[in-house]
Structure formats: C-alpha cells, structure tokens
Regions:
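Alpha/beta-hydrolase fold catalytic core
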Residues: 1-42, 64-67, 292-293
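Short beta-strand/loop motif that positions the catalytic acidic residue
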Residues: 233, 239-241
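Active-site loop/oxyanion-hole signature of alpha/beta-hydrolase fold enzymes
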Residues: 71-112, 116
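Conserved alpha/beta-hydrolase catalytic His-Asp/Glu region
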Residues: 147, 169-231
C-alpha cells in the first residue's frame, strides 16, 4: 500500500475539490485554486488513465506563477459522470459547456491538455473560437496510436474492471515495469514514488472499461491530429513532448514536427511520457513565454 507523500498532501491542501452539475444532470468534478489578485485562468485536462490528482504537481507550479488553476476530471474519471461519446466532437462539446461554467467571464489565459487530454483540448480548439490571447499547451500528445498500444488497448478493453485494476494498478511487479516505461528518469526515487502514489490513489477511481471502450475508440474514430492545424491555432499553440516518450514513440514525434511545423514545438530532454512530472519547469517556461509574447 502506497502512503501519501507529504508533497502531495501539502499541494492538495491548496486546492478546493468542487463538483459542478450541468444542465443535463451530469456532474463534473474538478480541483481549483485561486491565488489573491489572480486575473489569469489556467485549465488543465488530464490523460486517459489518470485523474485530476495526477496533475497536482503541475497545477501547483501554475499556482506559484499566480494563475487561478483548475484541473478538470474527464467524464468517467475522478468524480465526473460518464457521458455518451460518439467521437471527439462529443468531448469538445462537453469541454465547451464546462469552460462556460467555470470560466464565465472568458478569462481563460491557458488551456493545457496532457496525453489523451491533449486530443480533447485540440478537438475543442478546432471547433470553438478561442480568444487570441488564450494559449494552448499540448503536452505529451499521442497523435498516432502505436500498433503495440492498439493491441494492448483491445486486450484491456475486454478485461473486467476488477481484473484490470489488479493488472494495471496494484500488481507490484508490473508497477515497476510501468514506471520504467513511463519515466525517462526512473532512477529518481521521488519521481518513482510520485508515480506509484498516483497509480495507487487513482486505481480505486478508475472506470477502466469506459476509458478503453468509449473514450479511446472515440479518439481512434476521429483523431483531431489528422486534421491540419490552422494558422491561427498554430500561433496560439505550444506542442511539448519528451525525448524519451515510449508511449507515443519516435514515429509520433516525427509526425508532430511535420503536422505542427508552424506551431512552437518543444522537445523536453530527459523526459518520458509523464511530462507533467519530469518536464514541469519546461512547461511553465513555455507557458510564461507564450503569455508574454
């Protein structure tokens, strides 16, 4: 059993846990912190197998920069209600409604999507006009699904939630393998412990079958990274990925450089797929630079 670190407990104490009920009756869970005299809002969308909890280290870095920071739980994650999702436009509409509720005064300065969350953010940005002053960060995106990941997804989509949790979240041997796969700097004990803690905390909240059988297939059916990046959107976007991202792979990195050639592209050194842990300082630097541009 992984005990919670003082670091996470301390950071979590800054954030209020909130639940928003939408007009259709669905609930959206999110974490929020609002520093004094803050007039910039940063909204973060997490990845497929995580929740808002795993984004706390990154969210706290934005808090320290004076951002009102909101980390939203995707449908079926954390405390958010699962919703019917036909394709990524369904999630784009969902995010549009959520942002109208949590950012009613259009003060959104920064919208960041991590991993699968990057696909959600991109799908939203392609369909809804953002203010020119809003910056978009696509962190550790997965523009192309590696064949090995496709096989793994098909396998896990057929596994019951209880068994999937044992395999994916609580098996100690596989936990070690997963950490080495996700992190470039896996020898760092603090990084290993952070990842292990997130996996342990979030495993109990995982709606595995919904993620693998609803959300992932929706992304495969209507991958937003297959659509050209408009000139306006490119001017607002920073694409960031780790140089040792084994989840997306080198093929995805080459695709991103070609697809987003007019956007600001940052390859983070000594960083794997968990850029929200290993690449926090790089993300903050890119965000501040984009805001000041």
């Amino acid at each position: 059993m992984i005990s919670r670190t003082n670091t996470f407990q301390h950071i979590e104490s800054y954030f209020s846990r909130r639940f928003l009920e939408l007009a259709d009756g669905n609930v959206v869970a999110y974490r929020e912190v609002q520093p004094e005299k803050s007039n910039r809002v940063c909204v973060i969308i997490h990845g497929l197998t995580g929740t808002s909890y795993s984004m706390l280290l990154l969210a706290d870095a934005y808090r320290k920069k004076g951002f009102q920071t909101i980390v939203v739980d995707l449908p079926g994650h954390g405390g958010s209600t699962p919703i019917p999702v036909e394709d990524m436009s369904s999630l784009a509409r969902w995010l549009h409604v959520v942002l109208q509720e949590i950012c009613p005064n259009h003060r959104l300065a920064l919208l960041l999507g991590d991993s699968f969350g990057a696909s959600v953010v991109l799908a939203y940005a392609q369909r809804y006009a953002l203010l020119p002053t809003t910056s978009i960060i696509l962190a550790a995106p997965i523009p192309l699904i590696h064949p090995v990941l496709s096989i793994a997804d098909r396998f896990f989509s057929r596994v019951p939630d209880t068994i999937a949790r044992q395999i994916y979240y609580t098996n100690h041997f596989l936990l070690s393998v997963r950490i080495r796969f996700l992190l470039a700097q896996w020898r760092r004990p603090d990084y290993r412990y952070y990842v292990a803690e997130c996996i342990a905390i979030e495993g109990a909240q995982a709606n595995h079958r919904y993620a693998e059988m609803v959300l992932m297939p929706a992304n495969m059916r209507s991958n937003p990274f297959l659509s050209p990046l408009s000139e306006q959107l490119a001017s607002q976007t920073v694409i960031m990925y780790g140089d040792t991202d084994r989840v997306a792979g080198l093929r995805a990195a080459r695709y991103l450089r070609k697809w987003g050639n007019s956007a600001h592209i940052v390859q983070v050194p000594q960083c794997g797929h968990l850029i929200h842990i290993e690449g926090i300082s790089d993300i903050i630097d890119a965000s501040v630079s984009k805001q000041n541009h």
